[in-house]
Amino acid sequence: MAHPVMTFDKPSSASPKISFVSLGCPKALVDSERIITRLRAEGYELTKSHRGADAVIVNTCGFLDSAKAESLAAIGEAAAENGKIIVTGCMGAEPESLQTAYPDLFAITGPQAYESVMEAVHAAIAPPDNPFTELVPPQGIKLTPRHYAYLKISEGCNNRCSFCIIPHLRGDLVSRPIGEILQEAEKLVSAGVKEILVVSQDTSAYGVDLKYAETLYGDRTLRSKFIDLARELGSLGVWVRLHYIYPYPHVDAVLDLMAEGKILPYLDIPFQHASRNVLRAMRRPGDQEKTLSRIEEWRKLCPDLTLRSTFIVGFPGETEDDFQILLDWLSEAKLDRVGAFKYEPVADAPANDLDLTPVAPEVQTRRYQRFMEHQQKISARRLREKIGKHVSVIIDEASPKAAIGRTKGDAPSIDGKVHITTHRPLRVGDIVKVKIEAADAYDLHGKAV
């Protein structure tokens, strides 16, 4: 998905101009924000025009072949209008394929290679002598609306799921120091951010590579550990939402913080499948009966918990029995928010070497449709249970007599919305109480109280 990149007032008519294209997930968006912050700190101007820019940066996604195709198309569009194209991001980890498609690229860097990107920019067009560093806010430049922001806590992943090439592209887990994360979070809160969305490739593994090292932060000693980080973020007085949670046993401990209202009662856990056979082939945890028991315990500890997950249908070797196990599991789990993907073979993924029978594309499509229809009914029932309740909603869009927002159970872009009628003006970023009056397949409807 392409993320719009804002433009800024010119610091000087002579300022060098950079056009920027940001593709991919929220983790890639954070990388784009860091690069753009550096550009602005050095006095570069951002422009929407490839043709009028001194160079173009394309931050690519390479997780799936469809994402690679989108990235290549974006590079092609830029190359048609500009001779200095700098490619970074996940596709940059495989420069040979990029050079084959576009041999005249100015520079290629890998993911999170911020210094290499800036070196390429300097080679393309030198920065001005008098940068306007005062134009850069303390929290850095964000590409999200002012009231929420993504906070990336680590890079890479130690898991080796057979369908995934993230470790190949971004390496093993590298956690940021806990003090550095908290400093960034505090700057975001000071800048008016009302919701922090915690992201990484494997959020619940935070600190494993650091061996949970202790750090002096202010007058406190903090451990670089998932639960400790969650507790500290939960003390900042804003909404804190956890994404990309691998279901390790220690995740259970975070439910206490949710029940206490410290962090949002929301878990984004990609379960991926429910059949033991398929999960084994995926190299994922395979005891979904135990997972059902954990979900039941989580909901006892935190009755307001929202569970979001993603699944892959049509994985090589998936039989009709395997798929039915998945549907039956969904009926028991009663997850609130669910997304699904049809399996795509990805170059260099271990799944390519499993010697399993591919699922025919037409079978994949039918199973995907059945999956979505099945889960839609479950999600709709879960939403109808909220009718008549008063819920907290953060406002994303506002007009004089109406607004659109999200509950604590809804992340931006991927989950549902609340359509609100109101007799008083609401502002973007407000957190208000709304009485839910109706629900449809994905969204809620209510009145501000």
Swiss-Prot record:
The reaction(s) this protein catalyses: L-aspartate(89)-[ribosomal protein uS12]-hydrogen + (sulfur carrier)-SH + AH2 + 2 S-adenosyl-L-methionine = 3-methylsulfanyl-L-aspartate(89)-[ribosomal protein uS12]-hydrogen + (sulfur carrier)-H + 5'-deoxyadenosine + L-methionine + A + S-adenosyl-L-homocysteine + 2 H(+)
Cofactor: binding details: Binds 2 [4Fe-4S] clusters. One cluster is coordinated with 3 cysteines and an exchangeable S-adenosyl-L-methionine.
Domain TRAM, first and last residues per copy: 384-449
Domain of life the protein comes from: Bacteria
CDD domains: Radical_SAM
Cofactor(s) the protein requires to work: [4Fe-4S] cluster
Annotated [4Fe-4S] cluster 2 binding sites: C157, C161, C164
Enzyme Commission designation: 2.8.4.4
Keyword list, A-Z: 4Fe-4S, Cytoplasm, Iron, Iron-sulfur, Metal-binding, S-adenosyl-L-methionine, Transferase
GO CC annotations, alphabetized: cytosol
Pfam families associated with the record: Radical_SAM, TRAM_2, UPF0004
Domain MTTase N-terminal span(s) in chain numbering: 16-126
GO biological process, alphabetically ordered: tRNA modification
Residues binding [4Fe-4S] cluster 1: C25, C61, C90
A GO term, aspect molecular function: 4 iron, 4 sulfur cluster binding
Zinc as UniProt keyword: no
InterPro entries reported for this sequence: Elp3/MiaA/NifB-like_rSAM (IPR006638), Methylthiotransferase (IPR005839), Methylthiotransferase_CS (IPR020612), Methylthiotransferase_N (IPR013848), Methylthiotransferase_N_sf (IPR038135), NA-bd_OB-fold (IPR012340), Ribosomal_uS12_MeSTrfase_RimO (IPR005840), rSAM (IPR007197)
Localization in the cell: Cytoplasm
Function: Catalyzes the methylthiolation of an aspartic acid residue of ribosomal protein uS12.
HAMAP family: MTTase_RimO (MF_01865)
NCBIfam families: 30S ribosomal protein S12 methylthiotransferase RimO, MiaB/RimO family radical SAM methylthiotransferase
Family: Belongs to the methylthiotransferase family. RimO subfamily.
PANTHER family in alphabetical order: RIBOSOMAL PROTEIN S12 METHYLTHIOTRANSFERASE RIMO, RIBOSOMAL PROTEIN US12 METHYLTHIOTRANSFERASE RIMO
Protein name: Ribosomal protein uS12 methylthiotransferase RimO
